[in-house]
C-alpha cells in the first residue's frame, strides 16, 4: 500500500518512521523531565495557538503532525511525572510501565471478550488473582478492571445499589428507580468530588446522602456512624487527597 500524498512511501516504512520519530521525542522528553519547569511558561502557552485551526479538508504528512506535537505540545505539558511536581495526587509512571504501555498501544487489542484478545484476558486474570490474594478475598471472587478511581467508585456504588434492591426483592432491571424502596448513603464529609457525581448519576438525591464527621486525616469517626438500617450503603476511605 502507498499513500497518495507520499508517493512511493509504503505503509510499513511510514509506520516504522513514525514510531521511530515518536520514540525519539518521547526519550528526549523523559531525559529532560527532571530539568523541566513544572508548569509551561508564557511562550509555550502562546505557542499552543498553532493547534487552533479549522478541520483540514485534505490529508497532511503524518510526520508533520508528530513534529508539531513534539515542538509545540511538549513544552506546554505539565511535568506531573517529574520530581518537582507537588500538585494533585498524580503518580509518576515507572519506566517499565511506560515501555509496556507503548507495547500495548502497538498491540491495539480489543479486550471486550477473552476470544478477542487472549493476552488481555490472561493479564486481567493475573491481576484479579493478585488483588484477591492481597485483600484476602474468597478465591471465587470475580473482578473487572476499570479506567480509574472515578469509574471504580461509580461501579462499586452501582453494585451496592443492585445488591440492596435484590435483597428488597425490587425488580430493578424491569422497573428501574421509579417507585423503588429508598436507599440511604452514609460517608465521610471529606469524600472525593467524584463520589458526589457518581451518586447523582446513579439517581440518588441530596436528601438520601448523610455526611459524617471525620478527623484531620479524613478518616471517618466511628462515633459518628449511626445505627444502620438494612437499606443503607456506607462509603469508607482510608484518607483523602490532602492527607
Q: Which residue ranges define each predicted feature?
A:
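PLP-dependent aspartate aminotransferase-fold enzymes
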Residues: 90-104, 108-233
